[in-house]
Every structure is written in C-alpha cells, then in structure tokens.
C-alpha cells in the first residue's frame, strides 16, 4: 500500500462490517475518471470518492481498478508498524481551531439557522497532528480495522485527492436492481466487551426518535 502511494498509483482498500479480511482495488493503467455530473456514474464500475457538492473545482473521482477485491490480511504488520500506530493514537501534540475562530464560526451557523437559511448544520473542528517517524498509512488502516470491528473502514489514494482514511457504521446506499436501502444513525455508543450494547441509553433513544 505504501509503495502504491510512493509511485502515485490509485488504489482503495476497504473492510466491510462482518468481514475479517479487507479488499484491495488497484488501478495501474491510465488516469482516474473525473466526473462533474452524478448522472455520469450510471453504468460505471469502480471506487467512488465524492465531495458533498460536486463542482468544476471539486469533481467526483472514480478509481477504475485493473484488479478487483484482492484480500489484504490485517494481522501481518510488523511490531514496528504496530508501535507507530499506537504512538499516533496516543499523540497529544496537535493543532486545532482557536476558541475565537470556533466561536466566530458558531455565530455564523446560529444566524443561518435562525434566519432559516438552512434546516440543519454540523460544525466540526479540525485537528492537525504531527506525523511521527515511520508513519505508515497501511498500519493506521489495520489499527482502525482492529479497533472499529462493526464499521466500514477504507483507505484510498489518487494523485488528485491525496490520501483518505475513514470509518463509518452507516450504510450510505446498498442494494441491486429495484431495491435499495440506506441507513442514517444519529446515535453513538461505545463497545461493551467488544460488542454493541443491546440497550440504548436515553440520549441515543432521543436522537433516533
């Protein structure tokens, strides 16, 4: 994986909830496909990297792999790679938005909601963490797979998008032919003894109502 990044070769590796082995897609030939209208995705096959809003400066990127679904074991990283992943998890030195910057953004959000410009907004903070020596995107992906066993985990790269690593328990869209499904989760609960809690607390019941 790290070699793909070094030679700027597009790829995506992902682990579906319930599966133990991630799948790897690679594109060795040609450039990725840039799409400026979601309708152009009809009939296409590949791994999609999409922004919230498609524009001329921020198109959908489609990795069209030459090789599909190669298994990628997650338990064969070295002791050194595991140590780097642990150091990244325990990193305390990072940069984030200042209180003044965050308060200004929050004020803008509140005004937009009060004016009914938007029905819902989500204000998030960003963290900038120093990269530790020996950092490996693959090691962090493997660590995420071990930690978030019920989530969809992905690591993808293209020269146009850079490196993206993500994790979500939500099914954005799944199905085939005339039957499709989606899931929207408002609640968040920590694992208990490695399993999802069977009883929801009051906070999560309200968010799902």
Tell where the protein language model's regions lie, with residue ranges:
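Short Lys/Arg-enriched alpha/beta "domain-start" segment
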Residues: 1-31, 129-132
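Short, flexible beta-strand-to-coil junctions
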Residues: 14-21, 50-56, 157-160
């Amino acid at each position: 994986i790290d070699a793909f990044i070094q030679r700027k070769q597009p790829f995506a590796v992902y682990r579906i909830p319930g599966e133990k082995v991630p799948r790897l897609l690679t594109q060795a030939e040609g450039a990725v496909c840039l799409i400026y209208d979601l309708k152009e995705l009809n009939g296409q096959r590949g791994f999609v990297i999409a922004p919230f809003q498609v524009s001329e400066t921020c198109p959908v990127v489609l990795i069209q792999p030459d090789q599909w679904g190669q298994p990628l074991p997650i338990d064969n990283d070295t002791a050194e790679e595991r140590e780097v992943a642990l150091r990244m998890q325990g990193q305390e030195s990072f940069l984030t938005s200042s209180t003044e910057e965050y308060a200004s953004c929050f004020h803008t959000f509140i005004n937009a909601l009060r004016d009914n410009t938007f029905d819902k907004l989500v204000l998030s903070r960003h963290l900038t963490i120093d990269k530790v020596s020996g950092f490996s995107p693959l090691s962090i992906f493997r660590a995420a797979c071990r930690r978030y066993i019920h989530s969809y985990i992905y690591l993808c790269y293209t020269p146009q998008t850079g490196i993206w690593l993500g994790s979500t328990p939500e099914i954005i869209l799944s199905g085939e032919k005339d039957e499709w499904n989606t899931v929207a989760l408002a609640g968040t609960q920590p694992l208990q003894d490695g399993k999802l809690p069977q009883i929801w607390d009051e906070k999560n019941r309200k968010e799902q109502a």
